[in-house]
Structure formats: structure tokens, C-alpha cells
Amino acid sequence: MAINAQEISALIKKQIENFQPNFDVTETGIVTYIGDGIARARGLDNAMSGELLEFENGAYGMAQNLESNDVGIIILGDFSAIREGDVVKRTGKIMEVPVGEALIGRVVNPLGQPVDGLGDIETTGFRPVETPAPGVMQRKSVSEPLQTGLKAIDALVPIGRGQRELIIGDRQTGKTSVAIDAILNQKGQDMICIYVAIGQKESTVRTQVETLRRYGALDYTIVVTASASQPSPLLFIAPYAGVAMAEEFMYQGKHVLIVYDDLSKQAVAYRELSLLLRRPPGREAYPGDVFYLHSRLLERSAKVSDDLGGGSITALPFIETQAGDISAYIATNVISITDGQIFLQENLFNSGIRPAIDAGSSVSRVGGSAQIKAMKKVAGTLRLDLASYRELEAFTQFGSDLDAATQAKLNRGRRTVEILKQPLHKPLPVEKQVVILYALTHGFLDDVPVDDILAFEEALYDYFDVHYNDLFETIRTTKDLPEEAALDAAIKAFKEHSNFKS
């Protein structure tokens, strides 16, 4: 067989022309230190701040400190298998979490991985955990109410969709209960809820999940948990993962309620990471950017313009105080970022006033414009009346010689305090709140003994459900009070029918 040199030459030339180099160039570094959820690596000269980095054992970290000699990395997950000398490589990506409808009803960690034992989550969508907040022109003013189902909040410190309302108080004052009741009340309201548990005991998170499941609220809720036993980087990243999941729904035109329980523990985790990364400590050893830690998170909650779908994220961040000190560093930071605060007092809680809301220290800066007309009419003077009662009550400690007007104010105040009490996990629809507050402010409860107020309230709802459900329906559909004469007649008919009199 003759060998044709020209054919061989042409074949080799063609193969050289068609040759595609098949290799991957990745910038790598070497781990020089590992411990306490922190790694330092040398050789990653082009790493970006916030970039996701991969260790050779498959663990991931996030670049935080970009220094001249090395990169400070927080490790997202278990770091026990990482050793000094291990290779770490750049991914060219920033951290993302899975998002979408598939997450609803599930309990996940801050990386979006399921921890409820119900199998994998099938979702194709991802969002970066850190994204810019909507700009000024991308927002709308808060105009729609978010009903929590709690009379003390919906009447005194109303919340609107797109608002950030801080819940602040000592431990064991009912902060989580307020948020869980608000989530329960969103059933049938076309709201998606996200509960972010930061640094909580796993048994506590389990209890909250079971409560949500028992009342059917898990059908529209995502639970993101970074428990107390997990490394600080996961506690730090958990709120950002939660709001990234919320943003996916907001930009689809949906409404989301997100609860951060609580941001005090996130600040402590961030302080720990910052000190381990050798960042300069400031007041109370927190780093200088601890304000930015929370502001960039809470600014992502907004009511966006119609061009962006008209959706909203309403945030209820928690801050735990020590001995009721709301002037502490982290507390004042978050108060200045949010649109108001609900202050829960330990002495009110211990005296049986639950929810233990201190009306004098609580405020909603933008929620009033979202309150429905009916509630505005019946609760307009309630806050001032309550504050006046507290003041008079303090003065009566010094003597019992009171004129009739003062005695009447005290009697009305005691009934107001009783009416604003509410059992756990029993949120009320707004129409029932309006009717009982109307009865209170128009003097129908003045002759009812204080001890019978709660029984009177329950009986009134039952009576209206049977005989005057049309009044409830009017409030529900028109968002306004029905004819006062009709409401007066209905309440008088109930009082004649019942025996709640002194």
C-alpha cells in the first residue's frame, strides 16, 4: 500500500486547525489558618468581596477580608474537615440561595438545604443573598394594611404592607408569639410568610413549626433556621437568605411578611466573625459597619412600584433588650432604620396583660395611612385615652379622693386594658376588632364589670355571628363603619339579651 505524504500532511494540518484546548484555568490558593468558622488563604489575589470559594473537601466559604497577603474567609457549614495546606479555589460567583414556590411549607437552613426530613426541594430558581435595595423611584408609599389579628397592634400601632416594624423587648415577653399570631392571621389573605429563626434552640424552632402546621399556616410559610448550635457564619447569613427568598415573590407582584427572630443574635454572630477576622472593634466591641449590617437588610423590605409588579415585603425584625433598655447600641440602630417599634414590657407581661404592648413607647410612623377607615374611626383616640389612664392610675396611688370625671376615665381605662388583652394563637378578623372597640369607645362597656369583659367580648361575637352577620360583612367589604344607629341598636339588643351588667 502506497503512503501519500501529502494526504498525511493535510490530515495532520486539519487536526491541528480543529484542535480545541480542553483545560480549565482556576485561580487557587492555600489555606494558611483554619478555626472557629474562619479560614485564611494565600494566593487568591483576584478574589472579590463576597465571592463564593470552594475548598477541596467540597465545603464552601465566602470571601470577607481582602488583604495584601491573604484573604479572610467565613466558612458556610462544617469546617472540621478543612486543614491548613488544603487547596481553595475561586468560583467567580457570589452566594445564591434557591427560591420559588417549592420552598413553601418547608424548613431549610440558610443555604436553602432542607432540614425537615421531607426530601429534596425541586427548584430551578436562585437569587444572590446580597442584592441592592429598591431605589427611591422604585418604591410606593405604604397604603395597604397588614392585619396582625391583634387588637392592641391593629388599633394602636397599625402596620402597612411594605413597612418595617421593630418588635423590641426583654426575653420571655411574648415577641415570638406576636409574630406567630401575625403569621396565623395571614391565612386567606394572599400573603406568603417567611420565619427566619436566628440562634434559637432547635427545640424552640420545632415548637414554632408544629404550631404553624397545627393551624394550617405552614401551607403559606417558609421557615429558615440557623440554630444556636450552628457556626456563626450561618447565623450571619440567615436573614439575607430569607429576604432573598422573599424578593423572588415580591418581584412577581406578591405580598410577603418576613420575621427576623432575632437580629440581636445576628449582630453578636457578626461581632464574633469580625473579631476573628481581626477587624477593628468599636463600641461594645461591635465592628464599625454594624449599622450597615442591618440597614442593608431592612432596606430590602419595601412596597415596590407597579412597574415592578406592585408587590411588597413587610419586615418584623426582633431585638432583645436587657432590663428594658431600649437605648442600647443595637436597639437604637434598628429603631432608627425601621418605620416604628412595638415595645413589649416585662412588668405588663407578668401582670397578665398579654400581648404586653407599652402603648406609650410604641409607635408606627407610616402604618396610620394604611389603616382602614373603620378602625381609624373607632381607635382614633384610644392611644391618648390609654396614656391618660396610665397617668391617672399613677396619681391615684397617692389618694382615693377622686371626682366623677376622673373616676369615669379610670373605669374606661380599666376596660380598655381588658379589651386589648388577647389569648395566644387566636388572632381576630378586623371586623370583630372594630365592633368591640366601637362598643368600648361609645360607652357600652362602662356598666359591665371588669372581670366579665372578656366573656362579654366572646358572647358579643357569637351573637353578631348569628343575628348581625351583615354588619360584619359591611365592615369587611367596605372597610368602613356601617350606620352608627344600626351598630348601636345591635349592641343594645345584645346587652338586653345577655346579663352582663353591674
Swiss-Prot record:
Annotated ATP binding sites: G169, D170, R171, Q172, T173, G174, K175, T176
GO molecular function: ADP binding; ATP binding; proton-transporting ATP synthase activity, rotational mechanism
Name of the molecule in the record: ATP synthase subunit alpha
Record has Ion transport as a keyword: yes
CDD domains: ATP-synt_F1_alpha_C, ATP-synt_F1_alpha_N, F1-ATPase_alpha_CD
Stored InterPro entries: ATP_synth_asu-like_sf (IPR023366), ATP_synth_asu_C (IPR000793), ATP_synth_asu_C_sf (IPR038376), ATP_synth_F1_a_nt-bd_dom (IPR033732), ATP_synth_F1_asu (IPR005294), ATPase_F1/V1/A1_a/bsu_N (IPR004100), ATPase_F1/V1/A1_a/bsu_N_sf (IPR036121), ATPase_F1/V1/A1_a/bsu_nucl-bd (IPR000194)
Site (Required for activity): S362
Gene3D superfamilies for the chain: 2.40.30.20, ATP synthase alpha/beta chain, C-terminal domain, P-loop containing nucleotide triphosphate hydrolases
GO terms under cellular component: plasma membrane; proton-transporting ATP synthase complex
Biological source species: Streptococcus pyogenes serotype M1
Family named by the database record: Belongs to the ATPase alpha/beta chains family.
